[in-house]
Amino acid sequence: MDRYEAMEQRRAEVQAMLHPDGGQPLGGSGGSAGADLAPDVSDMMLTVIQGGVYGRPQLDIKTRAICTVAALIATDGGRYLENWIGNALNVGWSKEEIVEVISQLAFYCGVPNSVNAYGAAKAVFDARGL
């Protein structure tokens, strides 16, 4: 198995953890304009990120998910933030922990970004009945 094939295999494992219901991430299978317009590039990005970076042993998937949530809060990641809040819940973060991360970041990433993040979190929590 070559390196890219190994990353594709690890990507499938990561996807199973992040999306235990079999759902597709944003950016995969038509979930974003990029996936629609350049599916090969979208697929390659997901394989490298989730199969390469997420496959490294230094951090577990739970830690990587909350790091991604924090980065998306800091950069006002829009609909990707909702996706990753859902992923964080899927790998074991609680509603209360996610809200606390948003609160912590208000003072470092800006109140407007945190207000947007609270809205994204509420949408995810409401959709899941939390």
PLM region spans:
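N-terminal alpha-helical segment
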Residues: L46, T63-I66, L81, I98
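Short, structured motif recognition centered on aromatic/hydrophobic residues
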Residues: R64-L72, I102
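Short, hydrophobic/aromatic alpha-helical segments in well-folded domains
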Residues: W84, V101-Q104
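Extended intrinsically disordered, low-complexity coil regions enriched in Ser, Thr, Gly, Ala
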Residues: G77-E97, N113-V124
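A short structural micro-motif
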Residues: I73, V91, Q104-V111
